């Protein structure tokens, strides 16, 4: 009876999440009032800055939900960056508990609204205005209002999804948007191979699929890998028996699992949103009259610049995000309070330094791997023209969301069964 109730509750949660994700996708296809889609389609070729708009909104045309959770993610990044700098924010995060976290969430929502208005205004007055006939201030304000409301709704949907405790709402929205773009990628891939000679296309396709599946396995291994830091209690250290050697006792001890990719997909999410800001001046430079005679060289330089920016940002946000999630000093203090220690490491400052060293090393290695996924398409594209390699970071996000959601569902089922046994 209890098991059937648990399953029905789980089905209800999944149905609610799928409904909210469907609403997010529908928002992408509801056109902004007063903006004709055919004019925007022409603008993609006539206005070189429309490429930047497409990157920003994540869609080929403009819908009221095109901004999505981009302002929400940017606001979260800004709040996290400001927290260590302002004592009041740090106190709310560390000392106020749930009430403090709710207050920080409230600040994040306020900042999301402000940032959504800024981005909507930039899109309306700098990108849509030059390619729209009959422009007026009223039309501009309607566009800003539509995009802002769509972004706020996306933020609300993300928080509702997170409240179901089956995964992160923002990550799931990014996931569903990536999945929505898969048909276009497969269509372009089929056109590539249909245009090629069939005899040469089959070996190329098999080679590409083999490499792609290998990368999937590597990503899964990377996502699930972690380092064990053995910890022992004071009683275990003092316990000496002839039947149990020290090495045997250590083998049975508890440990702290530190994931190799502690930041998960968040460094990629952060870097992709911030990279857009750095790409803005590069897009202007590329479209300027000074580079009209060197368009090919400018395009290559822009590609190298793009990968370089993403490489640096991914490593930075990998280390930064881990520093927010894991606090070596707090971990050391908690171990001391529980009378646990790391074998061979003294309690106190030495434990803090050791944990800091291990965490920083893991964060850097994780950042390098994420950066490798960003760089890999650039190198493999010189040898294999395989469209799926262009979205390896998206692949990592897909795998990360799937594994995280699976573990959350498993944890939910286990916890409900445990509560039923009480």
UniProtKB/Swiss-Prot annotation:
InterPro entries: SecY, SecY/SEC61-alpha, SecY_dom_sf. GO terms for biological process: intracellular protein transmembrane transport; protein targeting. It is found in: Plastid, Chloroplast thylakoid membrane. It comes from the Eukaryota. Signal peptide: none annotated. Gene3D superfamilies: SecY subunit domain. The chain crosses the membrane at residues 17-37, 61-81, 114-134, 141-161, 166-186, 202-222, 265-285, 306-326, 364-384, 394-414. One of its GO terms (cellular component) is chloroplast thylakoid membrane. Component of the plastid Sec protein translocase complex, which is composed of at least SecY, SecE and SecG. HAMAP family: SecY (MF_01465). Belongs to the SecY/SEC61-alpha family. This is Protein translocase subunit SecY. It comes from Emiliania huxleyi.
């Amino acid at each position: 009876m209890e098991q059937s109730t648990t399953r029905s509750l789980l089905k209800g949660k999944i149905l609610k999440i799928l409904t909210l994700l469907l609403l997010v996708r529908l928002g992408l296809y509801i056109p902004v009032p007063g903006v004709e889609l055919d004019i925007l389609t022409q603008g993609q070729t006539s206005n070189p800055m429309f490429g930047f708009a497409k990157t920003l909104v994540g869609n080929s045309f403009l819908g009221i939900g095109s901004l999505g959770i981009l302002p929400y993610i940017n606001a979260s990044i800004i709040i996290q960056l400001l927290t260590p700098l302002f004592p009041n924010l740090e106190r709310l995060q560390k000392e106020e508990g749930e009430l403090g976290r709710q207050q920080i969430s409230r600040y994040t929502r306020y900042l999301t609204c402000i940032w959504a208005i800024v981005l909507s205004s930039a899109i309306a007055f700098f990108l849509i205005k030059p390619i729209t006939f009959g422009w007026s201030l009223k039309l501009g304000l309607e566009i800003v209002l539509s995009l802002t409301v769509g972004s706020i709704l996306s933020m609300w949907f993300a928080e509702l999804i997170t409240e179901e405790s089956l995964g992160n709402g923002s990550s799931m929205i990014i996931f569903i948007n990536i999945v929505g773009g898969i048909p276009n990628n497969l269509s372009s891939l089929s056109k590539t191979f249909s245009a090629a000679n069939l005899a040469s296309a089959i070996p190329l396709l098999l080679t590409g699929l083999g490499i792609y599946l290998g990368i999937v396995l590597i990503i899964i291994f990377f996502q699930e890998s972690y380092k064990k830091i053995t910890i022992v209690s004071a009683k275990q250290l003092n316990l000496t028996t002839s039947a149990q050697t020290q090495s045997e006792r250590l083998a049975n001890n508890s440990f702290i699992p530190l994931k190799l990719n502690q930041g998960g997909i968040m460094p990629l999410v952060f870097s992709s949103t911030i990279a857009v800001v750095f790409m803005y001046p590069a897009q202007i430079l590329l479209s300027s009259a000074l580079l009209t005679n060197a368009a090919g060289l400018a395009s290559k330089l822009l590609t190298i610049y793009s990968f370089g920016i993403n490489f640096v940002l991914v490593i930075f946000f990998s280390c930064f995000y881990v520093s927010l999630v894991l606090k070596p000093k707090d971990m050391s203090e908690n171990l001391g309070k529980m009378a646990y220690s790391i074998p061979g490491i003294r309690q106190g400052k030495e434990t803090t330094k050791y944990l800091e060293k291990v965490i920083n090393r893991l964060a850097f290695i994780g950042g390098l791997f994420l950066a490798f996924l960003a760089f890999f398409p650039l190198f493999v594209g010189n040898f294999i023209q395989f469209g799926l390699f262009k979205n390896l970071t998206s692949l990592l996000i897909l795998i990360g969301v799937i594994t995280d959601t699976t573990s959350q569902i498993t944890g939910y089922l286990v916890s409900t069964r445990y509560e039923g046994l009480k």
